[in-house]
From Swiss-Prot:
Organism: Xenopus tropicalis
Protein name: Protein FAM76B
Location of the region described as Disordered in the Swiss-Prot/TrEMBL record: 143-241
Job of this protein: Plays a role in hematopoiesis and immune system development, and participates in the inflammatory response.
Superkingdom field: Eukaryota
Family recorded in the similarity comment: Belongs to the FAM76 family.
Lineage: Eukaryota, Metazoa, Chordata, Craniata, Vertebrata
Amino acid sequence: MASALYACTKCHQRYPFEELSQGQQLCKECRIAHPIVKCTYCRSEFQQESKTNTICKKCAQNVKQFGTPKPCQYCNIIAAFIGTKCQRCTNSEKKYGPPQTCEQCKQQCAFDRKEEGRRKVDGKLLCWLCTLSYKRVLQKTKEQRKSLGSTHSNSSSSSLTEKDQHHSKHHHHHHHHHRHSSSHHKISSLSPEPEQGIWKQSHKSSTVIQNETPKKKPKLEFKPSNGDSSSINQSTDSGGTDNFVLISQLKEEVMSLKRLLQQRDQTILEKDKKLTELKADFQYQENNLRTKMNGMDKAHKDFVEQLQGKNRELLKQVAALSKGKKFDKSGSILTSP
């Protein structure tokens, strides 16, 4: 009977259910062609349509509508399209109140989601990025423990089969010896004359068995030591998994610190850019003010000179008028008798 085939959600070709991915139901070729990557702005995972596409659809729409985003004042993720906070932090602040310090990255960007949210991260108060990294580490450790458990179960089953085989052999040998002794008893009951010789033979066989049994005992006594070695292996494996968890946590911390450094560098670059723009604007305004001041000074000087010229002309006119009046008065005095 042929197994049922299921369609890939991307190329719509039919494959067995085991070959498709769990979440997106994608085939192997589509998983390679369209991998799941993180958005450069909001840091959320999305399926990449093309290799050049590094922004999710939501952020692309926001970029078209509001322009390039700024870093959020809480989480420093470059996703603040409106105002100084990203949409995730604004919604969390409305729902859970003001942010608190994250126990992992020590930033003021963790929102207390009460018992429901803390239960998923072992009661720790973590921000969004740190919760994602912590869940990833827990998932990896669970998968490793499952694989280690399967290997231990296989080894224990093989050791149990070996024990059963050894026990069956020992039981078969004991059963054969019991049959041999019963046959000796039957012979002794039938013929009482050679009783002593048969007893000697049976005594010899019993002494041989007694001498042989201690040789076999160490093998049986060696088994718990094997159990102890398996427990030692389990302890070393658990120590290895703990070390792996610590290493993965440290790697996640390094990655988060690198992200923080990149974001800080970007904010510093943006601030430097703003400073240069402000300096250029200040110099431009200063030059404009100087030109205006020079123009106003020149205009003022010209105006003063014009006023002084007018004043001189008026003084001349006043002097001329005063002379004319004197002349008229003297002429009138001479002609009057």
